[in-house]
């Protein structure tokens, strides 16, 4: 229903003034090649299904009881994985909920929060929802983030790393610089895609998660998600890592809205995913390999592809006609993401899919190029 037809006379002024986030398109048609929302092309660990089935088969009666409010088993597994104390780990109903709690817990109304101008589009929504001024810092000409541009008073900084939709990575040295220069502000590094960078060159410092810095900086908070690298977008589990005082603030805020954020099935499935390290590393590497091959194929077709460290590529057709390409692909049942925004409206964000999905995409692009060549001759 369009907003013009909705009776909003009983709404609060806050509800009237909201500009809600618009999620990525989720079409359900058969034979659709869906490469627009950065879902993992591989299924979750088989142990996830086994853990959930076990709960339903052996503990179904317990579903009448509330789940563990602090998700101790899952938080303990994450703490062990990253060599942290359990009080440095927070979990929530997807990283979007975790990020909303971050905005409510740390960012102030009398000092702005800083974020890149081209990044996750939920950040302005959170800021508007909580009445926080958001100052968007322009990316450099090559779409990189310059820490020097953030040298201004603020209550916090939030940066997606790797950034979306560009896929570019901010080095650990730059994150250390931001945290050190803003010791009285909370620095949030949103690592939804970090596992696709970290495993590519594990020995390179720039490939490492900022989790390795949280014992060095008490103002650094790192968020991650199970939706991307762990193939659990449908389960809705997110987490945050940081100094115990930051985690306590998130917990207090969470318990002021919903003291039971993760259900029993989500806790069981997510814990099983964390424990299956071999499967996790294997599928992440497969995505990285597919990203490399897709980048090469797109480059051969004349596309300008940014060096991605995520499970997607950001690619510009040689003539910049991204919207037209997206529309032609859609007509063939291939869905990619086009952003009608300045500076990036000539690019397509293409999720890393299966080999067969890539073949279908590349064949469609080759056919489109052949038609263009004939028309130009």
UniProtKB/Swiss-Prot annotation:
Its EC number is 2.6.1.9. Homodimer. InterPro entries: Aminotrans_II_pyridoxalP_BS, Aminotransferase_I/II_large, HisP_aminotrans, PyrdxlP-dep_Trfase, PyrdxlP-dep_Trfase_major, PyrdxlP-dep_Trfase_small. Residues 17-44 are annotated as: Disordered. The gene is hisC2. Belongs to the class-II pyridoxal-phosphate-dependent aminotransferase family. Histidinol-phosphate aminotransferase subfamily. GO terms for biological process: L-histidine biosynthetic process. It comes from Psychrobacter arcticus (strain DSM 17307 / VKM B-2377 / 273-4). Its cofactor is pyridoxal 5'-phosphate. This is Histidinol-phosphate aminotransferase 2. The modification N6-(pyridoxal phosphate)lysine is found at residue 228. Pathway: Amino-acid biosynthesis; L-histidine biosynthesis; L-histidine from 5-phospho-alpha-D-ribose 1-diphosphate: step 7/9.
